[in-house]
Regions:
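Short, basic/aromatic recognition patches that contact phosphate-bearing ligands
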Residues: 1-91, 173, 326-334
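A structural signal for short hydrophobic beta-strand segments in well-ordered beta-sheet cores
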Residues: 63, 185, 215, 277-278
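General beta-strand recognition
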Residues: 72-74, 157, 193-195, 286, ...
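Bulky hydrophobic/aromatic content
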Residues: 81-167
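Core beta-strand-centered patch of the WYL/Sm-like small regulatory domain
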Residues: 130-246, 250-256
Length: 334
């Protein structure tokens, strides 16, 4: 009985063996496949393996017979090729909104799409920078609930956390309950955002999904996005997110900034929670960070208008003065 059952699942184990143990550089002969099957308590003859391989090929598997580097078979095509798995793995590892635990789970699943030899070449998969990873293990459950609410046109209720300054330079987290009409989710600048409308206001808002907890779908229809945006029939996520700016680069220097407490979230999003904060008052705080002094950094600082003042270096202060004077000249002409 066990032998008959083994023969019924033999094809499944053969494709498992070819998937996990073969690639272009590592074919397996029919005899070797028989030996691998024996590890699963399945007996097979070498000649029968040829028929089994042909059945799998007829079904659609891209199994190649080769004589280089030795006689044997290997699985030539997979659902995801090696560079695709590497690319997806890098995206998962660098995504700040995916926790370290979930990152390891996802990259492990991606590795199972490769042969064991290909997986060994994925050296990058060993390293995960956990310093900026979220600790929110609810993330994927919340994404599923939010997606369901969007599909059903229902409002959602959740708690939303944000960083605040407490007792001098201590950064802590506070949470508030919100009811939101969800319209879309988007991945921007290493974070996953919910785009929606907070019921108290007549505009759109972007909320970091890694800061969302305890999502509840309400039995209440959403407020239509046409009431709070210029979109009518379709909410155009690509158009909406086009205004977001990207990363900056250049020569690294120590930059000391004086910031309004109102933009603590934006500052820690950009530079992380480990920034060294000094000179805290009821209105402002100072911090020093290594940053690229470039036109892009000038743009980022000026985006916050009077909420950021550059203390040092003088070079950066001068760049901002010059940019402000150039803008002023344009508007003085009119």
């Amino acid at each position: 009985m066990a032998a008959r059952r083994g023969q019924k699942v033999k094809l499944l184990y053969i494709i498992k063996i070819l998937t996990e143990l073969t690639d272009e550089d590592h074919p397996l002969s029919a005899t070797e496949i028989c030996e691998k099957l024996a590890a699963y308590d399945i007996t097979a003859e070498r000649k029968a393996i040829y028929d089994d391989i042909n059945c799998l090929i007829d079904f659609g598997y891209d199994i190649i017979s080769t004589r280089v580097p030795k006689n044997g078979y290997f699985l030539a095509s997979r659902d995801f090729e090696l560079p695709e798995v590497f690319l997806l793995g890098d995206a998962v590892r660098t995504a700040k909104f995916i926790s370290e635990k979930k990152t390891r789970e996802l990259t492990s699943k991606l590795d199972r799409l490769l042969s064991k030899y290909q997986s060994k070449r994925n050296i990058q998969g060993i390293y995960i920078d956990s310093s900026n990873k979220t600790h929110n293990e609810e993330l994927f459950y919340n994404i599923d609930r939010i997606n369901t609410a969007i599909a059903e046109g229902k409002k959602i209720k959740f708690t939303y956390s944000k960083r605040v300054l407490r007792e001098g330079r201590q950064i802590t987290t506070e949470s508030k309950t919100r009811v939101v009409s969800p319209y879309a989710m988007t991945w921007q600048f290493d974070y996953y955002y919910l785009i929606g409308n907070y019921e108290k206001y007549n505009n759109l808002m972007n909320l970091r999904i890694d800061r969302i907890h305890s999502v509840e779908i309400l039995d209440e229809p959403i407020r239509h996005f046409r009431e709070v945006s210029d979109y009518r029939d379709t909410f155009d996520v690509a158009d909406y997110t086009k205004k977001l700016f990207g990363m900056f680069g250049g020569n690294m220097q120590e930059v000391k900034l004086r910031c309004s407490n109102k933009i603590l979230e934006q500052v820690t999003d950009r530079f992380g929670d480990s920034i060294f904060i000094t000179n805290v008052t009821d209105a402002t705080f100072d911090f020093t960070v290594k940053a690229a002094v470039s036109d892009a950094l000038v743009t980022w600082i000026m985006n916050y208008e009077d909420k950021i003042e550059v203390i040092t270096p003088t070079e950066l202060r001068d760049k901002i003065k010059n940019r402000a004077e150039q803008i002023l000249k344009i508007y003085k002409k009119s």
